[in-house]
């Protein structure tokens, strides 16, 4: 049985949603996709999955999924689930008048839910030195997106 890449599926769903909105957007190529053509050492880390402009406001979007039922992991072993360079890129966008959101999807088979969470909230989660965040807290601090 082939492994399903839920992250790529989520990105494709976001791509379809962006096509329905009257905005300019583009998909930022993943570093690992580029590294086939460029040496790994010089392939730059990408700031997010999508860049959009809506009503004149630049918007940075990064998609993350989790199959955990009770919480969203902030770390996988010792690696951050949301790398520092992505949080820093979100901060730069906001300092320059844009908006940045991390789209967190609870990947439960019959109850998929997506929340847009600001970079400030993500930073707060990491400053709390926790390994994960309860979905209830994400529900309170994020914006639930519907189809």
Where are these regions (language model features)?
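Beta-rich catalytic cores
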Residues: 46
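Mg2+/Mn2+-dependent nuclease catalytic core
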Residues: 66-89
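Nucleic-acid nuclease catalytic cores
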Residues: 88-122
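Short, solvent-exposed loop/turn segments at secondary-structure junctions
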Residues: 33-36, 68-72, 110
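Short, conserved beta-strand edge motifs with alternating hydrophobic and charged residues
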Residues: 26-28, 60-63, 103
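Charged phosphate-binding loop/patch that engages nucleotide di/tri-phosphates or the phosphate backbone
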Residues: 130-147
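Conserved catalytic cores of phosphodiester-cleaving nucleases, focusing on short active-site segments
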Residues: 50-52, 57-68
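Acidic-basic catalytic patches of nuclease active cores, encompassing PD-(D/E)XK
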Residues: 1-43
């Amino acid at each position: 049985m082939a492994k399903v890449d839920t992250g790529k599926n989520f990105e494709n769903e976001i791509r379809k949603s962006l096509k329905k909105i009257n905005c300019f957007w583009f998909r930022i190529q993943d570093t690992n996709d580029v590294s086939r053509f460029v040496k790994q050492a010089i392939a730059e880390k990408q700031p997010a999955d999508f860049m959009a402009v809506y009503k004149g406001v630049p918007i940075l979007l990064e998609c993350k999924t989790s199959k955990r039922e009770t919480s969203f992991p902030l770390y996988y072993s010792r690696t951050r689930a949301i790398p520092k360079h992505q949080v820093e890129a979100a901060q730069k966008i906001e300092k320059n008048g844009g908006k940045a959101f991390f789209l967190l999807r609870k990947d439960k088979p019959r109850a998929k839910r997506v929340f847009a969470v600001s970079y400030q909230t993500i930073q707060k989660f990491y400053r709390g030195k926790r390994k994960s965040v309860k979905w209830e807290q994400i529900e309170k601090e994020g914006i639930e997106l519907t189809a």
